[in-house]
Amino acid sequence: MTNMDKLYEAVEARGPVCVGLDTDFSYLPADFVDSTLTRGEIIVRFNQKLIDATKAVAGCYKVQIAYYESLGLEGMKAYADTLKAVREAGVPVIADIKRGDIAKTAEMYAMGHFTGDFEADFVTLAPYMGLDSISPYLPYAEKQGKGLFVLCRTSNGGAKDFEYEKLADGRHVYDLVGDKLNALGKDYMGEHGYSSIGLVIGGTHIEEATEIRAKYKDSFFLIPGYGAQGGKAEDIAQYLTKGNGGVVNSSRGILLAYKKQPGTAFDEAAYNECVNMKEAIAHACSLL
């Protein structure tokens, strides 16, 4: 069974919410900060409480490495400890690293994030340099069932600068990326009909959502854009197949939920936000 199979089963059991642990130190409640601990240690405590509170309603977690790199060595220890905490909770974890290099460098990235202290179940990758920026990760997919989520059509405003450019045959650049990855993924299919090579598809392109889902029916989607970037449950539902086939990331919306729920502890508020998000998406899916 591949990690993508396990993610599919996690979504079936707990829903498609992907809790983004993009934990900026400024997000922490003032009364949670312990001056006797390092920032990294405090962030790990914060993340652990969030994991404990939300693991019953989270399909997976996504840990964005930049928030930890910015704190230097203590931050990278916090990153490793956070990955370990998620894995010990028995929930799939995505390392949001967006690596995009080739050859030996990519081999080292793959080893660094699929083994050892920074081991994760999935990594995010940027394909701009070509399929040889993806291939060094594939032995881990083949032998260990590891999964990839490759940037395809993203939710940021600047996506139009490259991704939306048209090719001579009328396709967009994101179509070319998706088509090549979809073809590559045929050799890495799992038991539940999804490839180990997933796509990052922003949840803010509702006008083409149904077409994208149908075109890449074998690809599991990592869907950013919910909440803070404008994606709504009724939009997100279009990217799913019977409520599965993708996970929907929310970071700030969950981490900062306590600010919209006065008097509620941050971990309880995060749980409430996950439940609300899960129920909203499930309702939207039921209307399709």
Describe the predicted segments one by one:
Residues A13, A58, T115-D121, E142-L148, ...:
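Glycine-enriched alpha-helix->loop->beta-strand junction motifs that scaffold or abut catalytic
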Residues L199, G203-N249, G253-A257:
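A C-terminal functional module that forms or caps the active site or interfaces directly
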Residues S70-A85, I102-E107, M129-E142, T204-R213, ...:
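Active-site-adjacent beta->alpha loops and helix N-cap segments on the catalytic face
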Residues I97, D101-G198:
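Conserved anion-binding
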Residues M1-V63, Y68-D81, A85-P92, P262, ...:
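Conserved N-terminal beta1-alpha1 strand-loop-helix module at the mouth
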Residues D22-S26, A66-Y68, K98-I102, Y128, ...:
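Active-site beta-loop-alpha junctions enriched in small/polar residues
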Residues Y8-V11, L83-R87, L138-E142, N182-K186, ...:
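Surface-exposed amphipathic alpha-helices with a cationic face
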